[in-house]
Design a protein with these regions (language model features):
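Short coil/turn segments at beta-strand junctions that form active-site/ligand-binding loops
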Residues: 1, 45-47, 107-110
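Active-site neighborhood of HAD-like aspartate-dependent phosphohydrolases
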Residues: 1-44
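Short His-Asn-centered micro-motif
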Residues: 5, 52-55, 114-116
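Short catalytic/ligand-binding loop motif for oxyanion handling, primarily in non-cytosolic enzymes
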Residues: 12-14, 58-62, 119-124, 139
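Acidic-and-aromatic substrate-binding clefts and catalytic sites of carbohydrate-active enzymes
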Residues: 28-29, 58-62, 89-92
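Substrate-recognition element of Asp-dependent hydrolases with the DxDx(T/V) motif
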Residues: 42-67
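C-terminal cap/substrate-recognition subdomain and adjoining C-terminal extension
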Residues: 68-177
Length: 177
């Protein structure tokens, strides 16, 4: 089981980020309360953490700079660790990076995506996506949903997502006579 983890909007909330940025104290951009909630998911499911955040550029199988080290330090306090990260592919969406990870790890069947933003998830990924409220970050409701998804109870996916509809309409407008 795998957790694809975004950082901003998941392991922090807007107030927490604002306070850290105001003080220019980037070491506090990860909220310990949110890490405790993440630990709950890991303990219940035995999942491994895959960093899918833009913070991944600071973490290359080892933290490569202070931001990567902060990620590791924040997680280590709770007995957690990043095991891998999604590939950083130039001009690719987060959705494409997660797809690339899954193609390179075909044995991964059970996974959840914790992210506050819609990155154009395709239908398969959308059913594994638990969207956090970026203003709130990870909360008890998202934790329960994530555990449920990891246990095989996938998220309902509308027949056509907003993203899919936008792409379809855009193509129709461009290619229609």
């Amino acid at each position: 089981m795998y957790i694809f983890l975004d950082i901003d909007g998941v392991l922090n909330d807007s107030q927490f980020r604002w306070e850290g940025l105001q003080r220019q104290d980037y070491s506090v951009l990860i909220d310990p309360k949110k890490v405790e909630l993440l630990k709950k998911i890991v303990e219940e499911t035995g999942s491994r953490i895959v960093l899918s955040s833009s913070w991944g550029k600071f973490w290359a199988n080892n933290p490569v700079d202070s931001a990567g080290k902060r990620i590791d330090a924040a997680l280590e306090k709770y007995g957690l660790a990043v095991s891998e990260k999604t590939p950083q592919i130039r001009n690719a969406t987060r959705s494409q990076e997660i797809e690339a990870f899954l193609q390179n790890h075909p044995y991964v069947v059970s996974y959840v995506i914790l992210d506050d933003n819609d990155h154009g998830w395709n239908r398969r990924l959308r059913s594994h996506w638990v969207q956090t409220n970026g203003s709130v970050g990870l909360d008890e409701e998202a934790v329960a949903l994530a555990i449920d998804v990891l246990r095989g109870n996938l998220m309902p996916v509308p027949k056509e997502t907003v993203w899919e509809r936008m792409k379809r309409v855009w193509k129709e407008r461009i290619y229609s006579p």
